[in-house]
Amino acid sequence: MTIYTFTSSEPHIAIVGGGIVGVILTLGLLRQNVSVRLYEQSAGFREIGAGIAFTASARRCMELMDPAIIDALRRCGAVSVSDKVADEDDHLRWIDGYNQHSKAHPTYQKPLAEICGSGFQGCRRDQLLEELAKHIPSGTIMFHKRLDTIQQGKDHKMILNFVDGSSNQADAVIGCDGIKSRVRQHLFGDNHPASFPQYTHKVAYRGLVPMDRAIEILGTWKAHNFHHHVGPGAHLTHYPVANHTALNVVVFLSDETPWPDSTTMVSKGTRSEVEKALQGWHPTVLGIVNLLPDELSKWALFDQGEFPLPHYSKGRICLAGDAAHASSPHHGAGACLGVEDALCLSTLLSQVRTTLTQADEGSKDKSESSMGQLLEAAFETFNLVRRTRTQWLVNSSRRVCDLYHQQEWADPIRCPKAETCFEEIRDRSYKIWHFDVDGMLEQTRT
């Protein structure tokens, strides 16, 4: 394990939230010899065992931050659709999940569209966090630290107060504490609508299916490749994880009713609820649903779409990942853009550290003032570089789900209209996948 050394004149960063983005940002800062400590409210890393996928551009961001991040991704069984553009399997595919087009071949599903997937790689969230944590030095992560308030001390330090009564200091704070971000609430106040996420009127039922069972329903080729099954008011997505030993399955349903409890985004659900909602769908879709456990978690999908954040930073406090731009998962890119955030921030804060170590420090008061100005400027630059792209993702994710759930899929006369949506989906997807990482880094230097 690499040993990192820091001096007291260099900035010390506090990261709140030990999810994927918080841990990757911690590794990126450590790689740049930026002093950092990560605070996580749980007793340990808490990510669920659901699947997560990263684009080629997101993995390039990981590589630029620290090659150990990519190594961790590979060790936890990340599997690729393909990194070869010419590979016939390197596609995301949309197929008709509702209509039966051939009575003679009841398992046949009409292909609707395919888009070059640009090298998506998927794995389990919990396994990735476990592997990433192996690269973080002892003492860098503090568990059981639920943030209460943030104050600025007389010495310009940021004081983090935790609900257990303890406090810690830092020169700057980055909130990576997810969709329910306490740091976001601190920045905007409890009365600002952007402080809290909003219900998108979509729910998701997630589960992992053994690959051998999935092959019995889907066939070998379809089971080992990414597919969306679309239809009226719902869609089912699946892709392989864990070195192709399991199939990650997610069923998304439209829900016109209000979510009953705004304090929690998950409730108990059942497979029978999904089967009822998908009554009349293609038998292949129903066959995959039948492989899910009887008891399921029902996840309400919230985002920042109704009230986007007007800015991502204020003073020496900044937001990144879902804390800044929580999105519904229909592009499968929320974590990818969070990784882009992490590269941008680690680059900017490395520049702050370099400037401070090269400058004539002068008096302590001058040094503290200079550090504060540099940190605030770094966070303002992050806001300028990242906000437009990430807020676009929030809106675009809602849009593509609406296209997946068109009622026209169930109408033979109107179905051809629904099928025209894929040109729009292609354009939106390419904007995410073919990201100019070098251009982003150049913006941090201007």
From Swiss-Prot:
Cystine pairings recorded for this chain: none
InterPro entries xrefs: FAD-bd, FAD/NAD-bd_sf, FAD_monoxygenase
Active site (catalytic residues): 206, 239
Membrane spanning stretches: 10-30
Cofactor: FAD
Keywords annotated in UniProt: FAD, Flavoprotein, Glycoprotein, Membrane, Monooxygenase, Oxidoreductase, Transmembrane, Transmembrane helix
Pathway: Secondary metabolite biosynthesis; terpenoid biosynthesis
Subcellular location(s) of the protein: Membrane
Stated family: Belongs to the paxM FAD-dependent monooxygenase family.
General function of this protein: FAD-dependent monooxygenase; part of the gene cluster that mediates the biosynthesis of eupenifeldin, a bistropolone meroterpenoid that acts as an antitumor agent. The first step of eupenifeldin biosynthesis is the biosynthesis of 3-methylorcinaldehyde performed by the non-reducing polyketide synthase eupA. Oxidative dearomatization of 3-methylorcinaldehyde likely catalyzed by the FAD-dependent monooxygenase eupB is followed by oxidative ring expansion by the 2-oxoglutarate-dependent dioxygenase eupC to provide the first tropolone metabolite, tropolone stipitaldehyde.
Protein name according to UniProt: FAD-dependent monooxygenase eupB
Naturally occurring in which organism (per UniProt): Phoma sp
Taxonomic path: Eukaryota, Fungi, Dikarya, Ascomycota, Pezizomycotina
Gene name of the encoded protein: eupB
